[in-house]
Design a protein with these regions (language model features):
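NTP-handling and nucleic-acid-processing catalytic cores
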Residues: 1-176
Length: 176
């Protein structure tokens, strides 16, 4: 293959441009962009809880009294295979986050969610008896420590402009 590529280069037939030239191997012709069809791919999506290492600090950040239940920040991802490599959970500094309590799968749970995604997330995970405890900007949670969901190690909460409320929970799992 390399000798064949060398001959193409020597003949001056290899050009560097801004767009690829798509070819049909069946017909031996170039294809226009309008002739290219992409296969739809459905990716799995999951919600994963990152429990607060210091749950009291989580309640202090929201200036509210602690309540019963596991407390943490859930993330939503369409790339679950990257979770083992997770190094942080990102929030947006200026988004409003709510601290809510309720029951998930029969367990009292306290979650941090972007306000704009509250209804969508609680519906998706089947949270019952949702009570809003407090709200705060994401910036108050910077540097908080969360437990990695699979490994015996902590990950920090960081701030990122890439975090949006288009889908998910308002928290983005971050892996290299």
């Amino acid at each position: 293959m390399i000798p064949a590529l060398a001959r193409i280069i020597e003949a001056g037939n290899l050009l560097h441009g801004a767009k690829p030239v798509n070819c049909s191997f069946d017909f031996g012709t170039e294809l226009a962009e309008s002739e290219i069809e992409y296969r739809d791919k459905t990716s799995p999506s999951i919600d994963v809880m990152f429990a607060a290492v210091d749950r009291e600090a989580l309640f202090r950040a929201f200036a509210t009294e602690p309540v019963a239940g596991e407390a943490g920040i859930p993330i939503w991802t369409t790339t679950p295979w990257t979770l083992p490599a997770n190094e942080a959970v990102a929030l947006h500094a200026d988004l409003e986050y709510v601290l809510v309590s309720g029951e998930v799968a029969g367990q009292e749970t306290v979650l941090v969610l972007a306000r704009d995604l509250l209804a969508a997330v609680t519906d998706r995970i089947g949270m019952q008896g949702v009570t809003e405890l407090a709200s705060a900007p994401g910036s108050v949670l910077e540097h908080m420590r969360l437990s990695h969901p699979f490994y015996d190690r902590d990950v920090p909460v960081i701030l990122g402009e890439h975090v949006t409320v288009e889908a998910g929970t308002g928290a983005v799992h971050t892996a290299p």
